[in-house]
Amino acid sequence: MSTLGLPPAVFLMGPTASGKTALAVSLRSRFPFEIISVDSALVYRGMDVGTAKPDAATLARAPHHLLDIREPNETYSAAAFCDDARARMAAITARGRVPLLVGGTMLYFRALLQGLDDLPRADAALRKRLEQDAAERGWPALHAELAALDPATAARLAPNDSQRIGRALEIVELTGRPMSAQLAQTPRALPYDVLQLALVPSDRAALHRRIGERFDAMLEAGLVDEVEMLRRNHVLDSTMPAMRAVGYRQAWAYLDGDIDLEALREQGVAATRQLAKRQLTWLRSWPGAVTLDCLADDLESRAAALVAAHLGA
């Protein structure tokens, strides 16, 4: 127990390609951690290459909770994540171990800390109307509409992020209040003493190089083949949340003949950079986070020292 009388937990947050998984596996080898994935794409079965899902050898050494828990034609929400994560955190703590939550889906981290109790459930009729509106005007037009109603939320979303734009507009219409204002409330605090580590690069150009190299490695490892297999084995369309993930939507467009391989690579890298930028925007204003340079040679030792102090190890 901490000095607060609460069990300890650690958040390891960071943008894509910042080395979160490698650091988490290293920390797990030194401390009594169990890893919980905080990633809206890693929940899907069969989506391995394009999500940089840890390979079998890594998972044998360091198992991860909340991987491969949904089919790619299913949805997964922040509310579902909170339920799943809280249940696993409680079980891990009961085993005398410490939850280490690792990922880059910042909304999930925030929802876990602050709760989503006041947000309404999805409204099928309203969502259908929004989707019909988007089909006529395009999601960027709805993003602009959201910017007028909830600028804080719109600033964090890409203009074509149909799932999240739709949800944010839905919340405004159902409650009369922007989602950002409701997320600022704390209806149910997380009952843990949480050390929050944020991986932020000192050199954005270096992170961009990593992103490009990683996307090239995904293409080499068979990203297009993976998406082709998913299309063959599941009833999918390009608007489903799983297929809106970075890399997957570009591969889908390639398989549809809308873009060539060069454009797939160019658009995929650009979209990944944009994702990293949004993640860093969250992290730079994240209250209570301890920032670590993900490019530093002493990253592991600095992170380990902070964890040791937090756990009293």
UniProtKB/Swiss-Prot annotation:
Q: What segment(s) does the record annotate as region Interaction with substrate tRNA?
A: 39-42, 163-167
Q: Which GO terms describe its biological process?
A: tRNA modification
Q: Which cofactor does it need?
A: Mg(2+)
Q: Decide whether keyword Transferase is in the record.
A: yes
Give the keywords, sorted: ATP-binding, Magnesium, Nucleotide-binding, Transferase, tRNA processing
Q: Which residues make up the binding site for substrate?
A: 16-21
Task: Answer yes or no on keyword Magnesium.
Answer: yes
Name used for this protein in its record: tRNA dimethylallyltransferase
Q: Name one GO molecular function term.
A: ATP binding
User: For this protein, what reaction is catalysed?
Assistant: adenosine(37) in tRNA + dimethylallyl diphosphate = N(6)-dimethylallyladenosine(37) in tRNA + diphosphate
Enzyme class, first EC level, given as a word: transferase
Q: Which family does it belong to?
A: Belongs to the IPP transferase family.
* EC number per UniProt: 2.5.1.75
Site label Interaction with substrate tRNA, positions: 105, 127
What domain of life is recorded for the organism?
A: Bacteria
Q: Which residues bind ATP?
A: 14-21
